[in-house]
Amino acid sequence: AHMKKPTLIETTENGKRVSPKLPPGMKNFLIDIDGTICEDIPNEEPERMADAALFPEALEKLNKWYDEGHIITFFTSRTEEHRMVTEEWLNKHGFKYHGMVMGKPRGGNYHWIDDREVRATRYEGHFTDLVERSATVQVFED
């Protein structure tokens, strides 16, 4: 269920070309797999991956975001040896997505440092609409 990636906007700063940006309003969703779109299965038990229990509302919400034009990329701690069984599972259930990045570090407590805008949403059991909310965040001191 792969689709052509969107046209990125070429960007320059101080007369030099820099990494391109997404069009306004478009999001790059990086979505975990185990415990987020299906039951949590550790890499040590790959025989369970083909029959992982789906979280139906995840399928509904992610496909809605895909249909709205956002980029859907799965970012998982599963390894390359799990890619085929994972892609087969995603396709069997009808997930629409653009790509999958394997080998996310395990253990949680992620802290992403980037020169681009980053938002993080912790999955706590339900895929609902995303809403704006203020929170305390850690930033680099000026």
Task: Give the label of every model feature segment.
Residues 3-142:
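HAD-like aspartate-dependent phosphatase fold
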